[in-house]
Amino acid sequence: MSIESVTRLVRTLRRNLAEITRSLYKDSDYCIKPGYRSRVENEHHDDTGFRDEWQREVYVYAAELMQRERLASVIDIGCGSGFKLVSLLGEFETIGVEVPPAYDLLRSTYPERTWFHWTEMPKPGVCADLVMASDVIEHFPDPGDLIAMIQAIPSRYVILSTPERDLIRGKSDFGPPENQAHCREWNSDEFRRYASLHFDVIDHTITNREQGTQLVLCRPR
């Protein structure tokens, strides 16, 4: 078989696999409008080079919640470089969850803090007053995987943030997302409905209109 034939075969197999995967992960299951097309093969997003350029307001919101409700501990799933977690929530007991290369960087940069590899969670006996995932859910082919992890961690509050599709793409956008690392994006109504399937939503707000960041504050059921 020639190289050209092998290349065509690989492309066909990848295309067929993408269609099969898309049929398994129906966007209607995630409360997204009919006709929307998600991305089934997304790029890994390495944000170890970022500090607080994105989603800073989410961490400020979390800090204010913890102070107001006198919470003591937080688990940050997909904490990236850890800068926002340590700088804005450093007065509390923190646990960060990541994958390499971020996981290795976190352990070497902040050895005094607690870091878990994604595959370690949920970890028996590990709990927190607040579990948060800041702009993480849009990276999952099946966001139910993230939801299941959060639900398995005993907590009092949950914070989820994600891009507000209509703000950053316009109401006529039907995907896939422009960001190659995103599988799908929700508008405000869709995200609130999806979060409400799994948690009791007690607040839903736009934390940064320019960046199009929306946030839901929830209580576990």
Describe the function of each predicted region.
Residues S161:
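Alpha/beta-hydrolase-fold catalytic nucleophile elbow
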